[in-house]
Design a protein with these regions (language model features):
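Catalytic glycan-binding domains that act on GlcNAc-containing polysaccharides
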Residues: 1-126
Length: 126
């Protein structure tokens, strides 16, 4: 049960496409969780416009939850396959660490702040 809870938290908090290379630049802090998730969402919903995805991520909590779970299941499976000898706890730590490493600075922008608010609700309601 504890492992399952940790995995749920890690999967929702991470919301990064670990298989996707991130663009590293001086403005990396603005390349936030929202933008990473938005870009990764295009992979799952290629027929959706970015405007529609942005709207759904900001206004449809169920869509945001299902997208996060889908992206993060893929990410977690990636780590599990890459490190088969790691414990469940270590895999979760890696997923959370990847999230924290990319998101330590406060990103700017109303979209990001609203999206983080949606995700904190998701985190505590799950």
């Amino acid at each position: 049960m504890v492992c399952r809870t940790l995995i749920s938290i890690a999967l929702l908090e991470s919301s990064l496409g670990l298989n996707n290379k991130r663009e590293i630049s001086l403005k990396d802090t603005s390349y936030s969780m929202f933008h990473i998730t938005l870009n990764t969402a295009k992979k799952f919903y290629p027929t959706y416009s970015k405007m529609l995805l942005k709207y759904k991520l900001l206004n449809d909590v169920d869509f945001a939850i299902s997208l996060a779970k889908r992206i993060l299941k893929e990410n977690f499976d990636y780590y599990k396959q890459k490190h088969p000898n790691k414990s469940m706890y270590q895999l979760v730590e890696m997923a959370v660490g990847a999230y924290n490493g990319g998101m330590k600075h406060n990103p700017n922008g109303a979209y990001v702040k609203k999206f983080r608010c949606v995700y904190s609700q998701v985190h505590y309601n799950e």
